[in-house]
Amino acid sequence: MVTAIYPGTFDPLTRGHEDLVRRASGLFDKLIVGVADSKNKKPFFSLEERLTISNEVLGHYPNVHVESFSGLLKDFVRRHDARVIVRGLRAVSDFEYEFQMAGMNRYLLPDVETLFLTPSDQYQFISGTIVREIAALGGDVSKFVFPSVDKWLKEKIAAQEQG
């Protein structure tokens, strides 16, 4: 049984993320979506919110499991005896960072491969940062996120504006 890890902050989970999950889940027996507790990035959604959102969107995939992790990715990968780390590459701008991370992961985890997947054409330009910025300015992000995520964004932005 081959287990893969797809790590990220998923702040918020977009249709691009789901596209990668859908495709990667067909390649592996088990895919664990690792929602990073990235305090350094100062996420818009709390870890608990990101876990809930991810489970809402991805819960229908029978071989996909969502859970949080903190600390080094290598420890999370080892804990699950995963053989592959899945990463998405949207553009050339992603490549340098992802290439460096893959090299470091290979050094730390010599028996684990990093698999890069490019998004489907309609999702190549989507990022959580762009989605949050558009939503915060009152723009329509419904083509980039699932309805439940759109609702979460609107509620969180409204609460911040009131608070």
Curated annotation (Swiss-Prot):
<feature type="site" description="Transition state stabilizer">
    <location>
        <position position="17"/>
    </location>
</feature>
<keyword id="KW-0963">Cytoplasm</keyword>
<keyword id="KW-0548">Nucleotidyltransferase</keyword>
<keyword id="KW-0067">ATP-binding</keyword>
<comment type="function">
    <text>Reversibly transfers an adenylyl group from ATP to 4'-phosphopantetheine, yielding dephospho-CoA (dPCoA) and pyrophosphate.</text>
</comment>
<feature type="binding site">
    <location>
        <position position="98"/>
    </location>
    <ligand>
        <name>ATP</name>
    </ligand>
</feature>
<comment type="pathway">
    <text>Cofactor biosynthesis; coenzyme A biosynthesis; CoA from (R)-pantothenate: step 4/5.</text>
</comment>
<feature type="binding site">
    <location>
        <position position="9"/>
    </location>
    <ligand>
        <name>substrate</name>
    </ligand>
</feature>
<dbReference type="InterPro" id="IPR014729">
    <property type="entry name" value="Rossmann-like_a/b/a_fold"/>
</dbReference>
<dbReference type="InterPro" id="IPR004821">
    <property type="entry name" value="Cyt_trans-like"/>
</dbReference>
<feature type="binding site">
    <location>
        <position position="87"/>
    </location>
    <ligand>
        <name>substrate</name>
    </ligand>
</feature>
<feature type="binding site">
    <location>
        <position position="17"/>
    </location>
    <ligand>
        <name>ATP</name>
    </ligand>
</feature>
<dbReference type="Pfam" id="PF01467">
    <property type="entry name" value="CTP_transf_like"/>
</dbReference>
<feature type="binding site">
    <location>
        <position position="73"/>
    </location>
    <ligand>
        <name>substrate</name>
    </ligand>
</feature>
<dbReference type="GO" id="GO:0005737">
    <property type="term" value="C:cytoplasm"/>
</dbReference>
<feature type="binding site">
    <location>
        <begin position="9"/>
        <end position="10"/>
    </location>
    <ligand>
        <name>ATP</name>
    </ligand>
</feature>
<dbReference type="GO" id="GO:0004595">
    <property type="term" value="F:pantetheine-phosphate adenylyltransferase activity"/>
</dbReference>
<feature type="binding site">
    <location>
        <begin position="123"/>
        <end position="129"/>
    </location>
    <ligand>
        <name>ATP</name>
    </ligand>
</feature>
<keyword id="KW-0808">Transferase</keyword>
<comment type="subunit">
    <text>Homohexamer.</text>
</comment>
<keyword id="KW-0460">Magnesium</keyword>
<feature type="binding site">
    <location>
        <begin position="88"/>
        <end position="90"/>
    </location>
    <ligand>
        <name>ATP</name>
    </ligand>
</feature>
<keyword id="KW-0547">Nucleotide-binding</keyword>
<feature type="binding site">
    <location>
        <position position="41"/>
    </location>
    <ligand>
        <name>substrate</name>
    </ligand>
</feature>
<protein>
    <recommendedName>
        <fullName>Phosphopantetheine adenylyltransferase</fullName>
        <ecNumber>2.7.7.3</ecNumber>
    </recommendedName>
</protein>
<dbReference type="InterPro" id="IPR001980">
    <property type="entry name" value="PPAT"/>
</dbReference>
<comment type="similarity">
    <text>Belongs to the bacterial CoaD family.</text>
</comment>
<dbReference type="GO" id="GO:0015937">
    <property type="term" value="P:coenzyme A biosynthetic process"/>
</dbReference>
<keyword id="KW-0173">Coenzyme A biosynthesis</keyword>
<dbReference type="GO" id="GO:0005524">
    <property type="term" value="F:ATP binding"/>
</dbReference>
